[in-house]
Amino acid sequence: MSQSICSTGLRWLWLVVVVLIIDLGSKYLILQNFALGDTVPLFPSLNLHYARNYGAAFSFLADSGGWQRWFFAGIAIGISVILAVMMYRSKATQKLNNIAYALIIGGALGNLFDRLWHGFVVDMIDFYVGDWHFATFNLADTAICVGAALIVLEGFLPSKAKKQ
């Protein structure tokens, strides 16, 4: 039995496109205006810093000889497909879940594009306190983390709020 896409969670796929445009646009600006390793202070504790990540979060498996590029690409594709199916099976009114899934898909596809096109992920956000620097990350990573946090938040909401 088929149903209208607008009645399913796929109605929220526009958010995937927004995340992709913002993420890929920011990476394009970095690639066009920064040399690898360049840093520009934005605010106290926040820099723009061009870095390349050949691995995953925190450069996990970055020095593994290249196979990790395809491994992480496969994971991104798999997760995106699974979440799209979950969106299709959910109602459009289940906003929190669908927004979370769309953010994760958008972030995963943004980093997937980098892996396939460049062979690495472009990172540029450098958060620091004093001499301690958090791992450099990008807007796709931020979308993935916000999406994951929304899924966790949804788990704590009362049943009535989950349906909306």
Curated annotation (Swiss-Prot):
Superkingdom assignment: Bacteria
Catalytic activity: Release of signal peptides from bacterial membrane prolipoproteins. Hydrolyzes -Xaa-Yaa-Zaa-|-(S,diacylglyceryl)Cys-, in which Xaa is hydrophobic (preferably Leu), and Yaa (Ala or Ser) and Zaa (Gly or Ala) have small, neutral side chains
Claim: DNA-binding is one of the keywords in the record: no
Keywords, in A-Z order: Aspartyl protease, Cell inner membrane, Cell membrane, Hydrolase, Membrane, Protease, Transmembrane, Transmembrane helix
Active site: 123, 141
GO annotation, cellular component aspect: plasma membrane
PROSITE patterns: SPASE_II
InterPro entries assigned: Peptidase_A8
GO biological process: proteolysis
GO molecular function: aspartic-type endopeptidase activity
Membrane topology type: Multi-pass membrane protein
Subcellular location: Cell inner membrane
Pathway: Protein modification; lipoprotein biosynthesis (signal peptide cleavage)
Primary site of residence: membrane
Residue spans crossing the bilayer: 12-32, 70-90, 102-122, 137-157
Its EC number(s): 3.4.23.36
Function summary: This protein specifically catalyzes the removal of signal peptides from prolipoproteins.
Family: Belongs to the peptidase A8 family.
Name listed for the protein in its UniProt record: Lipoprotein signal peptidase
Classification lineage: Bacteria, Pseudomonadati, Pseudomonadota, Gammaproteobacteria, Enterobacterales
